[in-house]
Amino acid sequence: MRVRWLRKALRDLDDEAAYIAADDWLAASLVVQRVIAAVGMLAEQPGLGRPGRVPGTRELIVRKTRYIVPYRVRVDSVEVLRVFHTSRRLPGRW
Protein backbone atom coordinates (compact mmCIF):
# COMPACT_ATOMS: atom_id res chain seq x y z
CA MET A 1 0.00 0.00 0.00
CA ARG A 2 1.24 3.47 -0.85
CA VAL A 3 1.81 6.09 1.87
CA ARG A 4 0.91 9.64 0.88
CA TRP A 5 1.85 12.64 3.02
CA LEU A 6 -0.53 15.59 2.90
CA ARG A 7 1.05 19.04 2.70
CA LYS A 8 -0.05 19.90 6.23
CA ALA A 9 1.71 16.81 7.58
CA LEU A 10 4.94 17.65 5.75
CA ARG A 11 4.74 21.23 7.00
CA ASP A 12 4.14 20.00 10.56
CA LEU A 13 7.18 17.72 10.40
CA ASP A 14 9.33 20.48 8.94
CA ASP A 15 8.19 22.97 11.60
CA GLU A 16 8.86 20.51 14.41
CA ALA A 17 12.31 19.72 13.03
CA ALA A 18 13.16 23.42 12.75
CA TYR A 19 12.02 24.06 16.32
CA ILE A 20 14.13 21.21 17.72
CA ALA A 21 17.11 22.03 15.50
CA ALA A 22 17.31 25.51 17.00
CA ASP A 23 18.66 23.80 20.12
CA ASP A 24 19.98 20.47 18.83
CA TRP A 25 20.16 19.61 15.13
CA LEU A 26 21.11 16.00 15.89
CA ALA A 27 17.99 15.50 18.01
CA ALA A 28 15.89 17.06 15.23
CA SER A 29 17.35 14.65 12.70
CA LEU A 30 16.65 11.70 14.97
CA VAL A 31 13.02 12.71 15.51
CA VAL A 32 12.47 13.11 11.76
CA GLN A 33 14.05 9.71 11.09
CA ARG A 34 11.85 8.05 13.71
CA VAL A 35 8.67 9.65 12.40
CA ILE A 36 9.48 8.70 8.79
CA ALA A 37 10.40 5.13 9.76
CA ALA A 38 7.21 4.69 11.81
CA VAL A 39 5.03 6.07 9.02
CA GLY A 40 6.82 3.83 6.53
CA MET A 41 5.56 0.78 8.43
CA LEU A 42 2.00 1.80 7.59
CA ALA A 43 2.56 0.69 3.98
CA GLU A 44 2.60 -2.93 5.16
CA GLN A 45 0.50 -2.57 8.32
CA PRO A 46 -2.11 0.17 7.83
CA GLY A 47 -3.99 -0.90 10.96
CA LEU A 48 -0.92 -0.42 13.15
CA GLY A 49 -2.17 2.74 14.88
CA ARG A 50 -5.01 3.03 17.36
CA PRO A 51 -8.48 4.25 16.36
CA GLY A 52 -8.36 8.03 16.03
CA ARG A 53 -10.20 10.65 18.04
CA VAL A 54 -11.59 11.99 14.77
CA PRO A 55 -14.00 9.54 13.09
CA GLY A 56 -12.51 7.75 10.09
CA THR A 57 -8.92 8.20 11.23
CA ARG A 58 -6.24 6.27 13.07
CA GLU A 59 -3.35 7.60 15.18
CA LEU A 60 0.17 6.26 15.10
CA ILE A 61 2.20 6.88 18.23
CA VAL A 62 5.84 7.24 17.23
CA ARG A 63 7.98 5.24 19.65
CA LYS A 64 10.80 6.97 21.52
CA THR A 65 9.29 10.37 20.69
CA ARG A 66 6.35 12.42 21.90
CA TYR A 67 4.70 12.56 18.48
CA ILE A 68 1.35 11.36 17.19
CA VAL A 69 0.67 10.94 13.48
CA PRO A 70 -3.03 10.90 12.55
CA TYR A 71 -3.74 9.13 9.28
CA ARG A 72 -6.57 7.80 7.16
CA VAL A 73 -6.65 4.42 5.42
CA ARG A 74 -7.97 4.56 1.85
CA VAL A 75 -8.61 1.69 -0.55
CA ASP A 76 -5.14 1.84 -2.13
CA SER A 77 -3.20 4.19 0.13
CA VAL A 78 -2.58 5.59 3.59
CA GLU A 79 -2.90 9.37 3.93
CA VAL A 80 -0.72 10.98 6.59
CA LEU A 81 -2.81 13.91 7.81
CA ARG A 82 -0.66 15.70 10.40
CA VAL A 83 2.26 15.34 12.83
CA PHE A 84 1.63 16.53 16.40
CA HIS A 85 3.68 16.76 19.57
CA THR A 86 1.76 15.23 22.47
CA SER A 87 2.00 18.45 24.50
CA ARG A 88 -0.22 20.21 21.97
CA ARG A 89 -3.96 20.32 22.14
CA LEU A 90 -5.18 18.28 19.20
CA PRO A 91 -7.83 19.79 16.93
CA GLY A 92 -11.29 18.30 16.62
CA ARG A 93 -10.76 17.68 12.92
CA TRP A 94 -7.87 17.42 10.49
Label each residue range with its predicted role.
Residues 2-57, 74-77:
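Basic, Lys/Arg-enriched alpha-helical interface segments
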Residues 47, 66-67:
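A generic local structural motif
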Residues 48, 60, 90:
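Short clusters of hydrophobic/aromatic residues that line enzyme substrate/ligand-binding pockets
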Residues 57-59, 68:
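Short, acidic/polar N-cap/turn motifs at the starts of alpha helices
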Residues 62-64:
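Conserved strand-loop elements at the edges of beta-sheets that form or border functional pockets
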Residues 67-68, 72-94:
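Enriched for short, Lys/Arg-rich terminal
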